[in-house]
Each structure stands twice: as C-alpha cells, then as structure tokens.
Amino acid sequence: GASELSVQNASHSRTFCFIEDAVEMIVRLSEHPESVGKVLNVGNQAPEITIGNLALEIVKIMKKKMTIVPMDGPTHSPSRRCPDMRLTQQLIGYDPKNDLATGLRRTYDWYRVNI
C-alpha cells in the first residue's frame, strides 16, 4: 500500500522561484539606478500551484507511492501568494530560467546528495 503524506493547507496556492533566479533578480535590481527607493518583488508570477499539487509533484520526482492527506494548517496563512512582478520585469526584463519542474528536480537531487 501507499504511505500517507500529511499536507497542511493543501488548497492554498503559491508560486515558487528557484534561488539562482532570485539571486540574479536581486543583483540586477541592486545595479539598476531606477530601483532605488522602490518596493520591488522578487519571485515568480507563474505557475501558481496548490500546496497539495506541489506535494504530488514532489512525490512523483521521488518515485514514491504516497497518498496526500490534507490537514488544516495555521489559520493566519494566506490562501494565496502570487507576487506582482510587473515593476521588476519592467526595470530589469528578467524572466526566471528555472521552471517549477526543473527547480523541484534540482532541489531533490541536491538533497539526495547532501542530506
């Protein structure tokens, strides 16, 4: 049988940004004169994915048979987090190079080797 994986707030949605892409955005923004004094988001606007579906994607990468069991989580957690990247994009014109699947795979591979 399949193992169970408990996932809090499985219906909440998020976007994710691979660290290399975040660092590249921060460096470019720090060097851009028009970014001074502005509040700018660093992240990814898409794809937006539920925490439950994210868990399913990770389980697939791990090649495990697991059943996702949704659980209640903290009530103060926002149900949706998706940054508005328009101003950052306008200033530096940067699109993240690592899509979600690549970022998850690279993170999983790193953990397998290092943890």
Task: Give the predicted meaning of each segment.
Residues 9, 37-41, 49-55, 63-80, ...:
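C-terminal "lid/loop" region of Rossmann-like NAD(P)-dependent oxidoreductases
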Residues 28, 57-60, 94, 109-113:
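Residues within well-ordered alpha-helical secondary structure of globular protein domains
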Residues 100-115:
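Amphipathic terminal alpha-helices
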Residues 1-3, 19-20, 24, 28-41, ...:
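Glycine/proline-rich active-site loop of Rossmann-fold NAD(P)-dependent oxidoreductases
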Residues 14-20, 49, 76, 80-83, ...:
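Residue-level signal for the nucleotide or nucleotide-sugar donor/cofactor binding architecture
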Residues 12, 44-45, 93-94:
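Conserved donor-binding loops in enzymes that form glycosidic bonds
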Residues 6-28, 38, 50-53, 102-106:
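Substrate-positioning beta->alpha
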